[in-house]
């Protein structure tokens, strides 16, 4: 298993925001703002002061995903409940598409699907490769939902139903 020292660019940590799009009990799914992908994690990766709800905005710090030598370990280093503390994460590539990849986060903590522009690599990604990155806990930015985002979700669902009805 690698560690934070295995990363070439691990010290290049950026701030990201996302919106809660699904809460399935122990797992929360986020749409990363800026069309940067989907992130699904267990709730122990969140600092939550409020109940989760659709459209709620969250923020965190994260480095780019990088390829690592060797196989992903069975666990990763867990951080303290501090939004500024960086956690070293490790994962295995589970899906490679033309312009995106998905990674399954070790210890069944969730998955991350992201566009290729969020990745640092010297060689093409392949299923089974190990990747690593630094990430902080995810913090809720407030109790309220982003109404514009929730409205967009409902509009997208409504259009999908209309298209399905037309095709049937």
Residue ranges with predicted function:
Residues 45-60, 118-134:
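Short nucleic-acid-contacting surface segments enriched for D/E, G, S/T with interspersed K/R
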Residues 1-16, 64-90, 148-168:
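Short boundary/loop segments of OB/S1/cold-shock single-stranded nucleic-acid-binding domains
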Residues 36-44, 109-117:
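A short macromolecule-binding patch
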Residues 22-23, 61-68, 130-145:
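Short, charged beta-turn/beta-strand-edge "cap" motif at the junction between a beta-strand
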Residues 19, 32, 37-38, 79:
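Long beta-sheet-rich domains in secretory-pathway and surface-associated proteins
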Residues 25-30, 98-103:
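Short aromatic-glycine-enriched beta-strand elements
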């Amino acid at each position: 298993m690698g560690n934070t020292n295995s990363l070439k660019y691990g010290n290049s940590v950026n701030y990201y925001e996302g919106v809660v799009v699904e809460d399935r009990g122990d797992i929360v799914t986020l749409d990363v703002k800026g069309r940067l992908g989907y992130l699904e994690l267990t709730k122990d990766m969140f600092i939550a002061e409020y109940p989760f709800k659709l459209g709620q905005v969250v923020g965190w710090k994260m480095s780019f995903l990088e390829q690592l030598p060797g196989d992903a370990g069975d666990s990763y280093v867990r951080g303290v409940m501090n939004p500024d503390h960086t956690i070293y994460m490790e994962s295995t590539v589970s899906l490679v598409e033309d312009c995106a990849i998905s990674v399954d986060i070790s210890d069944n903590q969730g998955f991350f699907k992201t566009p290729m522009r969020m990745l640092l690599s010297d060689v093409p990604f392949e299923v089974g490769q190990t990747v690593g990155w630094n990430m902080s806990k995810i913090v809720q930015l407030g109790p309220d939902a982003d109404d514009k985002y929730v409205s967009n979700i409902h509009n997208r669902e409504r259009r999908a139903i209309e298209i399905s009805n037309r095709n049937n």
